[in-house]
Amino acid sequence: PLSGQVYYIQYNVCQEDPALPMEDFAAQVQADLEAGGYSRVLVDLRNNGGGSDGVIWPLLSVLRQEMDDGTEVVGLIGEATFSSAIINAVELQEMGIPLVGEPASGSVDHFGSVSGFSLPNSGIQIGVSSKYIDLGTLLEAGLGAQVEPLVPTVLVEQTLDGYLAGRDTLVDWLLANG
């Protein structure tokens, strides 16, 4: 928790943690939210460079239940939000969750589903996108964005002064404007 009423989730990679699978993590979050009486949940995707977009689905289910019970959920995005994390951010928008922060570094529609192979003579590993992801055809929240960067509902930039002082300008803004 960031304050008595705000619960913070930092989601930095779209990949299962063998030590804490997403199903277990989502159940832990649900138990915390039920026990804590939180009025707001922040889901931070700002440092998430992607992975597998479906990993977050158990958590989205918990967030949907919390929203139905009156809890406000806010998504945080920024320059390091990329690939599958952009898909997750658009999924948050699709649920009616506002995004706050800075524009993401990747576009809403993008190449993804990376497949790998080794070069035969050197053994160097290569990753190649194998699919074009057109979110506008999958999610209403992605309509019209095409290859434009994902932009937040509310633009709040990290300031240099805040950074140098070790302050998270976006979280400070959200706590002050809750």
Predicted regions and their residues:
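C-terminal "post-core" interaction segments
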Residues: P1-G178
